[in-house]
Amino acid sequence: MNPLKVRLGALLVDQQLLKVLLNALTGSLDASKSDDESTAVYQVLSILENLVDLNPEGLFGRDSVVSARTAGPAGTASSLESDWVNILEYLAKNRLPTKRVEVDSNAQYASEILAIILQSAGGRLRKRFVEELGGVDVALRALAGYRTVPPETPEQIEYLENMFDVLCALLMEREAKEAFIAGEGVELMVLFLKGRTAARTAALKCLDFATTRYGKAAGVCVEKGLLGLLFAVFMGRSSVKGTAKGGKRRREREEAATREEEEVRCVSILSNLFAGLGAGSADVDLTQKRQRIVAKFLERDLEKLRKLVEVMVVFAGRVASEEARIGDVFEGEDEDDVKEEVLLAKMDAGLFNVQQCAIVLAELWSTENEFALRKGIVTMLHEVELTLKFLKMTLTDYADSLGDGDEEEVEGTGGDAAQRQVRRLISQLGTD
């Protein structure tokens, strides 16, 4: 972080800039009255965006105590946080449109600023937005207007993308996951998947975030008919209505990138569903829902299993290539000194995707009395010159990366539980 930018951000906050901007927005400016005032509102929003860019951690305080210098004259983190809550309230209640036709440049920009703030802020501010201002409901209502009819104008397209970003930022918090389920967020995302519009990819991302380390969401997803839609996307049987623009090559690149993103989202969601539905659970309902996932992999001569292996192999190849490349770059360096950089490079190449594929394969392997799956896994791995040992090594590295499991427990699937799940899968894979 540039120290000059950090200093400038602190000075601006010291001078109560947030309060000045909020007073301008709520007092003297009304974007609906004239073009001049509409332009002024846009400029104020631009100042907010630039302010966040100066020093996100210092301006929001993250989840730690903010220094008196950064927190303003009141000298407290809470006063700074309250200023941001007021900004969020203004954006949510006054700048977000209630109808599709009302999305203009200011509404689009307000949704962008809202997303930027929530992505940059710490969990405490996101939780307050959820609990005090109904943030999840705000996002769901904004998205609901596009559940069957796609956006038509450039402003509507960007507005929809921004509101999905808002929802995903919120879904990093447990409180938001709970509100998402209560507000029928799963049902709304299912409608987006059925609509086969460009919003489908964003809907998958939301479901991925909602099901991550939150067991309750897994059961709801199965109940609401997600599996059929999820596998249709994963297998490429549910195409999105033409959205890519430009020449043929550009369209092909965009479509390939979208296709790949959707595949890895599907795998991640499946991994989350298995974790949330708990193997060996005494709950009959959870066991039955888990079995419904397994049954999907048994259909059509194990085609979904083969697809899963194919996806894993693609990313494993990229990771291996990157590992070799970066090994040459750091040749002669102490291994401990470059360990973090090597790991980051492998993650960028797709290591996490390989790990998620391995988890799903191991979950299928661990299913009782499904010998066809075990035979299929061994056979398909052998076809690509891999064995169960590769799965075990991948999962062992992943379990080690989970650390000491000090993350917040969320419905039994966070922190320690996530590591226990992976260790259980490793043990059930046995010896190669």
Residues of each region from the PLM?
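Hydrophobic residues within the alpha-helices of tandem HEAT/HEAT-like
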Residues: M1, S28, V41-N55, A107-A121, ...
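Elongated alpha-helical scaffolds that mediate protein-protein interactions in large eukaryotic proteins
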Residues: M1-Y109, Q119-D137, T153, L170-G183, ...
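Buried hydrophobic core positions in alpha-solenoid tandem helical repeats
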Residues: L17-L25, L48, W84-R95, V138-L143, ...
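Residue-level detector of extended alpha-helical repeat arrays and alpha-solenoid scaffolds
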Residues: S34-V44, V103, A107, R126, ...
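Short, highly charged low-complexity linear segments
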Residues: N55-E57, R128-F129, A199, A203, ...
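Amphipathic, alpha-helical segments enriched in basic
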Residues: L114, E155, F164, K205, ...
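A compositional/structural signature marking long, glycine- and acidic/polar-rich segments
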Residues: D137-R250
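Alpha-solenoid helical-repeat scaffold
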Residues: A217-D432
